[in-house]
């Protein structure tokens, strides 16, 4: 199982890097999604869900549909969420890209919040404590977290397996 997860994780990592190369102004979002999903399939995995590319005020989970005319903007905040699976073992990861200097600090805040979460996560730590680290980091950059998005547990064949990690110190998520 661990070997498969590492292999699929490598596919997701490479797929995200590939997606970053494709994110250019005026490129159709659907085209990027289709190319990234084809990349995943070409690397002996299957998409765990449709590639999500969310722009600006759309915080997450935007899925381009056939005929979608949405283009990557010249300036903006682009979030790319990719998941792949093999034999039901799922890996899910996302990255935030700043297009233009206006959004650079927000993208840095997102990355720093992820690093704070990873540095806080240890055996015995409660989910709310990770959320506290995330919220403090984001607020240090002058932003507020999105309260209705969370990290989530993944199980075999199950992308959202119940256990969540909030972006703020929600003690009900312990």
Give the ranges of each region predicted by the language model:
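Active-site neighborhoods and metal-handling regions in enzymes and metal-associated proteins
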Residues: 1-174
């Amino acid at each position: 199982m661990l070997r498969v997860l590492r292999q699929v994780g490598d596919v997701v990592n490479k797929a995200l890097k590939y997606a970053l190369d494709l994110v250019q102004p005026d490129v159709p979002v659907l085209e990027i999604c289709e190319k990234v999903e084809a990349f995943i399939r070409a690397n002996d995995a299957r998409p765990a869900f449709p590639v999500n590319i969310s722009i600006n005020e759309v915080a997450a989970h935007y899925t381009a549909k056939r005929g979608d005319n949405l283009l990557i903007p010249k300036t903006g905040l682009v979030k790319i969420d990719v998941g792949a699976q093999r034999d039901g073992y799922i890996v899910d990861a996302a990255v935030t890209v700043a297009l233009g200097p206006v959004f650079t600090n927000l993208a840095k805040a997102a990355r720093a919040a992820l690093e704070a979460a990873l540095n806080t996560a240890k055996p015995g730590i409660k989910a709310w404590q990770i959320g506290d680290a995330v919220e403090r980091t984001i607020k240090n950059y002058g932003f507020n977290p999105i309260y209705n998005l969370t990290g989530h547990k993944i199980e075999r064949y199950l992308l959202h397996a119940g256990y969540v990690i909030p972006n703020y110190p929600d003690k009900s998520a312990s």
